[in-house]
């Protein structure tokens, strides 16, 4: 079966969520979003890459923070999903239910994107004062924790201060998610450097399971992170990347962010799919072969 006939119990920009009793089945589709818009085209293999990279990082950092992953093996999924195993292979994970902490935990190691824009305006990133003289792709003196609110689909996330984060979730939880975000980012950046990758920035989400702050959703994927090839890194320039920046760049050049979201040209779809698969191979050190072919 090449799709799910069963309607999801909830739907995000990229993931479909199904109730599975004491757990959830989280399915990473091939949908792609940019600038908080869901685009009309799908990117081949994207969902599987996201799902399997997340599983890789969850396993790698299990000693730093607990996570919600139960299994990505369709044989472990509840029987009610058995008829969909071919479709789910590689792109779905069974996860523990969590009480979501309503904060996007963004860590920035380099100056780019919206951070560069606000730095150019007032010398700060999310209210944090930075040294003078930084430029596009400058490495920051220390990684920054820059939280934002979690917006509903169609709305935009709002950058907030750490103090505002404390007001929303309480100082204890805010401190835990800040410290964990920075710890995971630093460990991931150190590992990625051995693979020839710079993690410019990334986003984590956390929940509470059995009273413990737990890493949930996705982890260090091309959707939630900017991955730059270290070999071609050059401060002061826009960096090539193994993520959806290719799509963002095309949209910036060809769409004014009003009206219907445009279809992507075939070369952007194919190029993005290739970048995602390349990211998987470089990060995990294994050749990408779709699990669907072996389901």
Predicted segment positions?
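A long amphipathic alpha-helix within ATP-dependent nucleotide-binding catalytic cores
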Residues: 169-200
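Generic recognition of stable, solvent-exposed alpha-helical segments in well-folded globular domains
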Residues: 48, 52, 172, 176-179, ...
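Coil-to-beta-strand transition motifs
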Residues: 23, 100-102, 196-199, 210-214
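C-terminal helix-cap and adjacent tail motif
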Residues: 219-279
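Catalytic cores of nucleic-acid ligases and guanylyltransferases
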Residues: 29, 88, 214-222
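Conserved metal-phosphate-binding beta-hairpin within the catalytic cores
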Residues: 107, 199-219
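Active-site loop/lid in soluble adenylation, ligation, and acyl-transfer enzymes
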Residues: 1-151, 257-263, 267-295
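A short mid-domain helix/strand-loop element embedded in enzyme catalytic domains
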Residues: 139-171
């Amino acid at each position: 079966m090449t799709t799910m006939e069963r309607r999801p119990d909830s739907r995000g920009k990229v993931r479909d969520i199904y109730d599975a009793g004491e757990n959830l089945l989280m399915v990473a589709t091939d949908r792609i979003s940019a600038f908080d818009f869901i685009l009309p085209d799908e990117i081949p293999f994207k969902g599987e890459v996201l799902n399997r990279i997340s599983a890789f990082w969850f396993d790698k950092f299990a000693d730093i923070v607990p996570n919600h992953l139960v299994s990505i093996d369709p044989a472990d999924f509840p029987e009610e999903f058995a008829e969909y195993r071919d479709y789910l292979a590689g792109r779905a994970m069974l996860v523990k239910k969590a009480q979501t902490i309503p904060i996007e935990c963004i860590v920035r190691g380099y100056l780019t994107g919206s951070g560069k824009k606000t730095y150019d305006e007032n010398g700060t990133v999310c209210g944090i004062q930075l040294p003078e003289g930084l430029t596009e792709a400058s490495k920051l003196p220390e990684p920054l924790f820059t939280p934002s609110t979690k917006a509903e689909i169609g709305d935009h996330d709002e950058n907030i201060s750490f103090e505002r984060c404390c007001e929303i979730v309480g100082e204890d939880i805010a401190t835990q998610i800040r410290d964990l975000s920075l710890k995971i980012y630093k460990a991931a950046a150190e590992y990625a450097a051995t693979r020839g990758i710079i993690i410019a920035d990334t986003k984590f989400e956390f929940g509470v399971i059995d009273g413990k702050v737990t890493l949930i959703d996705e982890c260090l994927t091309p959707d939630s992170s900017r991955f730059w090839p270290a070999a071609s890194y050059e401060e002061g320039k826009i960096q090539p990347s193994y993520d959806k920046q290719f799509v963002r760049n095309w949209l910036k050049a060809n769409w004014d962010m009003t009206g219907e979201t445009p279809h992507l040209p075939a070369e952007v779809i194919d190029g993005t799919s290739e970048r995602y698969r390349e990211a998987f191979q470089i990060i995990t050190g294994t050749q990408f072969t779709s699990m669907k072919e072996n389901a």
